[in-house]
Amino acid sequence: MYFLGDVHAESPLMRDFLNSEEKYCLQLGDFGFIFKYNDWKWNRFLNHFEKNYPNKMIFTVLGNHENYDSIEKMPVKNMFGARCRKIRSNVYAVERGEILSIEGLNILCIGGADSIDKAWRQDGISWWTQEKISDTDVKKTVEKGLTCSFDMVCSHAMPAFFMLQNFTPCFQTGSEFSLEKIYCDIENNGGHIPLWIGGHVHNSIDMMYNDTLFRSLNIGEKIIYHKNDSIEDKFLIH
């Protein structure tokens, strides 16, 4: 399984996946290829990928720099056990609180984040209110985490304690606390999260918290991980 950090619609950041032997990519938000409706740049990559790589698939958990109004109009499909929005026949956005069961991995997905630059953006044009992780998203994700088996969490943003350890408080924008609540509610009620990975912060950082390994991926950073691989070997920064 090919895990990929933020892309921001920069198609060159997808090349390694296209040239790899991996069939599936899980992209960790700020995918960015659905931003301006029918924009030629974004559609060019998506159409090229659909036509020329029919045996590969991209899944994204979505971030904050996405056009949620357009994405919410896309058809809903069940893919590998998860409710997804169909962007192309081989490109899907995984909805929040869904478990994607693929390549032997059960991945609990929770996209979304708050934009720190939204004051300079325009609602419905370059910023969308749906980016924020809602209380309903938190409840659904916790319920899935406590009732279903999973191997890891994939998010866009990272929990508040991760941010406070590694960044100044000005980067606390809201959704980090929702993610912290998800972590605590699962861990304090009999569940366990061995691995949590995300993007958003544009830095490669690893951190152990209790018995969970947290790992943020930089822009365009990749990690290839399979079911029987060592978490520490693959996700710790050596």
Label every model-predicted segment.
Residues L4, A9-I102, Q172-T173, L217:
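Core catalytic region of metal-dependent phosphoesterases/phosphodiesterases
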Residues D39-N47, D135-T141, T173-K181:
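Well-ordered, non-membrane alpha-helical segments in soluble/globular domains
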Residues M57-V61, R85-S89, F161-L236:
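Conserved beta-sheet core of the metallophosphoesterase superfamily
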Residues H8-M14, G32-K36, L62-E72, I99-L100, ...:
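Active-site environment of divalent metal-dependent phosphoester hydrolases
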